[in-house]
Amino acid sequence: MKDEGKAMQDMMWPRQDANIMDYGKESLYKFNLKCSGNVSENFSKFGDVFFKAAHVITEYILERQRIGELDCYFFPVAYLYRHSLELKLKAIAFKYIEDSGEIFIKETFHNLIKILEYIEPFIRDEINTDEDAYLWMKALFEDMNPIDKDSDAFRYPFKIEIRKDEVWGDKQYTIKKFFEGQKHINLIAFANKMEIVFDILCSYYENKKKRYEEYKKYNTFF
């Protein structure tokens, strides 16, 4: 929306055919990103675009089959897939949360298992249609959780931890590695697992009662 007399411009996001370059270039502030009032729909839309980005990049690197790209792109792909799952889980939660959701966010944060357990009572009918698929997904989350419960392992290959010196009380900064050594990952299996989980969560979000077969081809180990 263009309005040269307005300091801050509102740009609804995400939206159809959005152009982030479409703003008043003379305004004091370029634009203010806003979402619609429906929190659940916003989380769902963001989840969809994160998933699409992960899928497109995965197809690209698998088609090219270049070892250097497979190594370099794994972390971004894993982050995009993982975050799409978190967003879809939160979309489900906010379909049923009637208050501001502050308690939900505080209690679950980025933890996939905690979010899944929080929403389970709301989607019990959908889960009962294929509880084995739900338990498979939950086991996969439990295996991922020690590595990435705070949604930062795939954004950065390490995290900064702050500790206080026991004697002087000074702050000490240390680096914690998420992966201590070389790890071999089947990217095709990993991507397929993420896409199966996303499909299951989409059916929960849409209150569809579906049965699944594809997950049976894969174990629940990260």
Which ranges hold each PLM region?
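Domain-scale activation on soluble regions of proteins
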Residues: M1-F222
